[in-house]
Swiss-Prot record:
Species in which this protein is naturally found: Xenopus tropicalis
Listed pathway(s): Protein modification; protein ubiquitination
BP GO terms, sorted: negative regulation of cGAS/STING signaling pathway; negative regulation of epithelial to mesenchymal transition; proteasome-mediated ubiquitin-dependent protein catabolic process; protein K48-linked ubiquitination
Domain B30.2/SPRY: 85-274
Assembly: Substrate-recognition component of the ECS(SPSB3) complex, composed of spsb3, cul5, elob, elob and rnf7/rbx2.
Taxonomic placement: Eukaryota, Metazoa, Chordata, Craniata, Vertebrata
Name of this chain's protein: SPRY domain-containing SOCS box protein 3
């Protein structure tokens, strides 16, 4: 009996399941029913080549979460990845680094993708609660206008997939535009800037190496200096570089996005202050003191003033301090700073600030 020829289209349907983006399910859950005929970015594939289907495309993201990049040494944050469903549910909530009780802004319940859920007084955002079919995003409920703005985002879930990003953008960013496409949303156009968990920085669709990766337990700090129009990123409370300049007079919002199923991020600090003489002095003090010391502890300040500065400008004085250095910093970043402790990363550029202050 003659052998029946293979149906190439049927084989394409079978093998296309391999090409489905790994974001579509949590890395610790059993595989869901596959959607036939779709490639890794959610777009329909018209290729009839059997050879191409036998190999994974190089752009397929890893379903294995990033580990070992946590701010703290909690076991649940740094343990090697285990695909066991039991292990996933046994991960305990880590509270390290969450000292603040007052927040200038939280996530905006009216400016978010449909695949997002808010909790913890709108400070924690969870993406794709059951499964993922694209990219979800959200922005803060306050526009970052005049002054100095600093906030920290903590990765409270496994970090994996096509992309999970932290950044800023204008009100023109369509947060629901890519709800059926897996992509790096922040920085895809000229209206936003985004830092990926892979360490890539993106703006206008152009990506560049910026830092090492970050994962569950990592704390990503963002400083927007509207006085000079400068955007700076921190990882685990150590500077990793200046990401953008010439941002003056732009109406920006804090933003995050994720393609990963059952992923989440939490605002653990959001504060702002005027570009005052007090701020400039604190920024200069941080530059002059070694990174190994806590500025508020070593300076002979009256208790009342120390408390006021701690509440208002603690983020300026404590970046890179001893408390932060007890945790692992970003030592492999390739950024404009040259190193995590580079003084050019300290908030404020004193020479330029001094000149502008004289004009006031």
């Amino acid at each position: 009996m003659a052998r029946r020829p293979r149906n190439s289209r049927a084989w394409r349907f079978v093998l296309s399941g391999v090409r489905r983006d790994q974001d579509a399910r949590s890395p610790t859950l059993p595989a869901e029913e596959e959607a036939w005929g779709y490639d890794s970015d959610g777009q329909h594939s018209n290729s009839d080549s059997d050879t191409d289907l036998l190999h994974l495309p190089p752009s397929i993201p890893s379903a294995v979460p990033v580990t070992g990049e946590s701010y703290c040494d909690c076991d649940s944050q740094n343990d090697p990845y285990c695909s066991s469903l039991h292990t996933f549910h046994q991960i305990k909530s880590c509270q390290c680094g969450e000292e603040d009780n007052y927040f200038d802004w939280v996530w905006d319940d009216c400016s978010k993708s449909t695949a997002t859920v808010l909790s913890c007084d709108n400070r924690k955002v969870s993406f794709h609660m059951e499964y993922s079919c694209g990219t979800a995003a959200i922005r803060g409920n306050r526009m970052l206008t005049e002054g100095q703005h600093f906030w920290e985002i903590k990765m409270t879930s496994p970090v994996y997939g096509t992309d999970m990003m932290v950044g800023i953008g204008t009100s023109d960013v369509n947060l629901d535009k890519y709800r059926h496409t897996f992509c790096s949303l922040l920085g895809k156009d000229a209206e936003s800037w985004g830092l990926s968990y892979t360490g890539l920085l993106q703006h206008k669709g152009d990506k560049s190496n910026f830092s090492s990766r970050f994962g569950q337990g990592s704390i990503i700090g963002v400083h927007l200096d509207t006085w000079h129009g400068v955007l700076t990123f921190y990882k685990n409370r150590k500077c990793i570089g200046v990401a953008a300049t010439q941002l003056r007079n732009k109406k920006l919002f804090p933003m995050v996005c994720s393609t990963a199923a059952k992923s989440s991020m939490k605002v653990i600090r959001s504060c702002c202050c005027r570009t005052s003489l007090q701020y400039l002095c604190c920024a200069r003090l941080r530059q002059l003191l070694p990174d190994s010391v806590d500025s508020l502890e070593v300076l002979p300040l009256p208790p009342g003033l120390k408390q006021v500065l701690g509440n208002k400008l603690g983020w300026v004085l404590q970046m890179g301090s001893n408390r932060s250095n007890q945790h692992k910093g970003d030592t492999s970043a390739t950024t404009s700073c040259g190193s995590d402790s580079d003084s050019s990363c300290t908030p404020g550029q004193d020479d330029c600030q001094r000149k502008r202050c004289r004009r006031i």
